[in-house]
């Protein structure tokens, strides 16, 4: 009998500890976890109205005949246009609360200008000169 107790006391102790831990967890859940899971409704009555649409316009002009353009659309996805005729412009609209438009342009002339306007207001305008001039415009938040 004592020989079996010497070998079985560790598994018995583990069994008692697991039983006490299970009972403790069950008791704690009756106090703190008895309300169930909260479900967030899909349609909110107090949703704010959409923002007024923002109109973002990219413009590139210069002394050359064509331009290579890289810009971010309003979803911040990079777009590329090779060999666009000058002058070039693009108008985008969004109802997002903010946008971060930017554009990079390189032409075959000696002068190039980029401009970003938001709702008719010029936010950034830059001009570069030199062989195959390159310029960029960047608006941190529109």
From Swiss-Prot:
Keyword Cell inner membrane attached: yes
Pfam families with a match to the protein in the record: Mycobact_memb (PF05423)
InterPro entries xrefs: MmpS, MmpS_C
Listed transmembrane segments: 7-26
GO-annotated cellular components: extracellular region; plasma membrane
Coarse class of the protein's main subcellular location: membrane
Gene deletion effect: Deletion mutant does not exhibit a low iron growth phenotype, but has attenuated virulence compared to the wild-type strain. Deletion of both mmpS4 and mmpS5 drastically decreases synthesis and secretion of siderophores, and greatly reduces virulence in mice.
Alphabetical list of Gene3D superfamilies matching this protein: MmpS1-5, C-terminal soluble domain (2.60.40.2880)
The keyword Secreted appears for this protein: no
Induction: Repressed by MmpR5. Repressed by iron. Regulation is IdeR-independent.
Signal peptide (from-to): none
Membrane topology: Single-pass membrane protein
Annotated compartments: Cell inner membrane
Keywords: Cell inner membrane, Cell membrane, Membrane, Transmembrane, Transmembrane helix, Virulence
Function comment: Part of an export system, which is required for biosynthesis and secretion of siderophores. Essential for virulence. Overexpression of the system confers non-target based resistance to azoles, clofazimine and bedaquiline, via an efflux mechanism.
Subunit structure of this chain's protein: Interacts with MmpL5.
Assigned protein family: Belongs to the MmpS family.
Protein name as catalogued: Siderophore export accessory protein MmpS5
């Amino acid at each position: 009998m004592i020989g079996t107790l010497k070998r079985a006391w560790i598994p018995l102790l583990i069994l008692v500890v697991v039983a006490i831990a299970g009972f403790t967890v069950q008791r704690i859940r009756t106090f703190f976890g008895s309300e169930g899971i909260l479900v967030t409704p899909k349609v909110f009555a107090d949703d704010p109205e959409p923002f007024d649409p923002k109109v973002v316009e990219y413009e590139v002009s210069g002394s050359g005949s064509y331009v290579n353009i890289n810009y971010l659309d309003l979803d911040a996805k990079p777009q590329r246009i090779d060999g666009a005729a000058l002058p070039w412009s693009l108008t985008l609209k969004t109802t997002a609360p903010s946008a971060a438009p930017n554009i990079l342009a390189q032409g075959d002339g000696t002068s190039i200008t980029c401009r970003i306007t938001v709702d008719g207001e010029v936010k950034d305008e830059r001009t570069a000169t030199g062989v195959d001039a390159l310029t960029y415009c960047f608006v941190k938040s529109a």
